[in-house]
């Protein structure tokens, strides 16, 4: 019996450690998992999300999937929505002070988070909390007590604060308070483990520090997951950078975006996003190297897996069929944006109004480069007028517009 528990704990710890950059307090995590398998006693893990954007992308899911792994091994997840701290704005990695959100924006975005996380997390083992529950009650005396727990000198050790201080870029006192408030969340929740990205290390360690300072009998472990690179393979996945794959993307878009990553980045996505074991992934890599498995097929399988997870197997297979139809067989897609106009229209103007070109200047350049087709015939004249009827305008391989001229 004891031997069987030890094996299960070892397997759990291998799963937990997969793809993780750093774990502080791994022995404590192992003791919690072992306790669960011996007695069934659960433990508390948490990760905070400031709802500054309404949609999750795959970069967020690296952390959320790790939380789901913990749920399999005895954890109750607290998905903490930082509605209070979002009205301050986390300065992590920023060179300028961020504008706070209104309460209405925060609550609207928080609802969107809740709708999405249960695509990954087990609802029966997840608690959604808002940190306004305790931070609004902190009061002046509580805030003074909290700020007395940490020095300005220690705060300036944080990399982004240090850089801004040396460059004489303004740092507001509110921004100093942010990591203290995030750390206080761990005190209020008495969390056993906290998750975050590698860029959050300072704030995560603040939780451990404050748990000690407030006399808690526990000191949370900290687990840091890597930052997922975006589609460009260089910068971190970010909606503002446009290099993201959103959890709520349409199946066709999600599938196509996964296929657009480089062969090298594909393996990074496999490690951090796929449900396949590391042994299975290593076998795939060996098969690709030996020529037994084409990189394109490996990428298609990854795109199918990810699209199925956030939609359905049927949606994923239809997305693959649509992609093959448009990009492999050079056929017209089943669905595309549509623009209706009255009277003939200049092609460049139609491209802009239909949303397949940002400007008439860019439309001209695309035509001159030979990238524009009408009804699968290359456009030669940048001054072409389109008259009565239906015209399928194509820019490159990915952009289509159905133009109906009345």
Swiss-Prot record:
<dbReference type="InterPro" id="IPR002305">
    <property type="entry name" value="aa-tRNA-synth_Ic"/>
</dbReference>
<dbReference type="GO" id="GO:0003723">
    <property type="term" value="F:RNA binding"/>
</dbReference>
<feature type="short sequence motif" description="'KMSKS' region">
    <location>
        <begin position="236"/>
        <end position="240"/>
    </location>
</feature>
<dbReference type="InterPro" id="IPR036986">
    <property type="entry name" value="S4_RNA-bd_sf"/>
</dbReference>
<feature type="short sequence motif" description="'HIGH' region">
    <location>
        <begin position="51"/>
        <end position="60"/>
    </location>
</feature>
<dbReference type="GO" id="GO:0005524">
    <property type="term" value="F:ATP binding"/>
</dbReference>
<dbReference type="InterPro" id="IPR054608">
    <property type="entry name" value="SYY-like_C"/>
</dbReference>
<keyword id="KW-0067">ATP-binding</keyword>
<dbReference type="Pfam" id="PF22421">
    <property type="entry name" value="SYY_C-terminal"/>
</dbReference>
<comment type="function">
    <text>Catalyzes the attachment of tyrosine to tRNA(Tyr) in a two-step reaction: tyrosine is first activated by ATP to form Tyr-AMP and then transferred to the acceptor end of tRNA(Tyr).</text>
</comment>
<dbReference type="InterPro" id="IPR001412">
    <property type="entry name" value="aa-tRNA-synth_I_CS"/>
</dbReference>
<keyword id="KW-0963">Cytoplasm</keyword>
<comment type="subunit">
    <text>Homodimer.</text>
</comment>
<feature type="domain" description="S4 RNA-binding">
    <location>
        <begin position="345"/>
        <end position="405"/>
    </location>
</feature>
<comment type="similarity">
    <text>Belongs to the class-I aminoacyl-tRNA synthetase family. TyrS type 2 subfamily.</text>
</comment>
<protein>
    <recommendedName>
        <fullName>Tyrosine--tRNA ligase</fullName>
        <ecNumber>6.1.1.1</ecNumber>
    </recommendedName>
</protein>
<feature type="binding site">
    <location>
        <position position="239"/>
    </location>
    <ligand>
        <name>ATP</name>
    </ligand>
</feature>
<dbReference type="InterPro" id="IPR014729">
    <property type="entry name" value="Rossmann-like_a/b/a_fold"/>
</dbReference>
<keyword id="KW-0648">Protein biosynthesis</keyword>
<keyword id="KW-0547">Nucleotide-binding</keyword>
<dbReference type="InterPro" id="IPR024108">
    <property type="entry name" value="Tyr-tRNA-ligase_bac_2"/>
</dbReference>
<keyword id="KW-0030">Aminoacyl-tRNA synthetase</keyword>
<keyword id="KW-0694">RNA-binding</keyword>
<dbReference type="InterPro" id="IPR002307">
    <property type="entry name" value="Tyr-tRNA-ligase"/>
</dbReference>
<dbReference type="Pfam" id="PF00579">
    <property type="entry name" value="tRNA-synt_1b"/>
</dbReference>
<dbReference type="GO" id="GO:0005829">
    <property type="term" value="C:cytosol"/>
</dbReference>
<dbReference type="InterPro" id="IPR002942">
    <property type="entry name" value="S4_RNA-bd"/>
</dbReference>
<keyword id="KW-0436">Ligase</keyword>
<dbReference type="GO" id="GO:0006437">
    <property type="term" value="P:tyrosyl-tRNA aminoacylation"/>
</dbReference>
<dbReference type="GO" id="GO:0004831">
    <property type="term" value="F:tyrosine-tRNA ligase activity"/>
</dbReference>
<dbReference type="InterPro" id="IPR024088">
    <property type="entry name" value="Tyr-tRNA-ligase_bac-type"/>
</dbReference>
